[in-house]
Amino acid sequence: MNYFRGLNTVTLAFFISGLSVFCSAQDDHTILLYTFATGTGKVVKDLSGKGNNGKFAGEKLSWGKGKFDGGLVFGGNGPRDHIVVPDSESLWLKDGLTVEMWVYLNFWSTAGGTGETKEKSYKVGPQSAGRTVLRLTTDEKDWGNAALTSNTDIPTKSWHHLAGTYDTKSGQAKVYLDGKLDGKIKIGGTIISNNDMLWLGRGQGPFLDGRMDEVRISNIARTEDEIRTLMDQGIEGVLAVSPKRKLTSTWGYLKVRR
């Protein structure tokens, strides 16, 4: 009996110490986290704890099938579908940036990025040449001269994971396609923030024609391993379940085993 009690205690302690692994999708650096799992209403719930909820805009934006579960369906330039996220201080990036998302493109965009856009501050998403663009304004380079385009076209009619990162300390910008590095350059400087709203599914002019799922924005440059983990497991998979529910269910299991 003492052996099992000791084993249970060790197992529980190990589990508690591992909560940070389960919750890595939602850490102190996560400023926006969308699973699109609600599937109702006209508001997208932010799971980051920062309160950056999004609102539907456009004529036909709707819930639909995503990569993992629910997602959003965007109708392109005609209906001008997009998500509007009101400005907040948590969206004012300075030291770093990571934007991650799943997209399903019906067609390539007609101009610059239609993924995430905070105009004249930072954007990451598909662009008209069929590739991923990352664009910034820093205190060393302006919006027109601080851009990185991926090396590989994003295939249409299938789901693909896009990510872009920027680290102020190194000045390095990187873009990823399906978890693999697909381009990098040195931009340099600190990201310049502004009080513009943040958009999903549009740029200054073009609008996404396709679907979107699982968006995470962070205020640091995440590693390739972190990006790949979220891509492979999905937000729900990385979170597993909330720590409180996980602890309760695991402790109940251990008590049965005693």
Describe the role of every protein-language-model region.
Residues 2-5, 15-78, 183, 228-258:
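Extracytoplasmic low-complexity segments
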Residues 27-31, 40-44, 52, 77-138, ...:
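Extracellular glycan-recognition modules
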Residues 59-66, 123-127, 189-191:
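Short, exposed beta-strand/loop patches in secreted or surface proteins that constitute
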Residues 68, 184-211:
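Flexible glycan-contacting loops in extracellular carbohydrate-active proteins
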Residues 87-89, 149-153, 187-188:
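Beta-strand-rich interaction surfaces with strong enrichment in secreted/lumenal proteins
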Residues 142-145:
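Short beta-strand and strand-turn-strand segments in soluble, beta-rich domains
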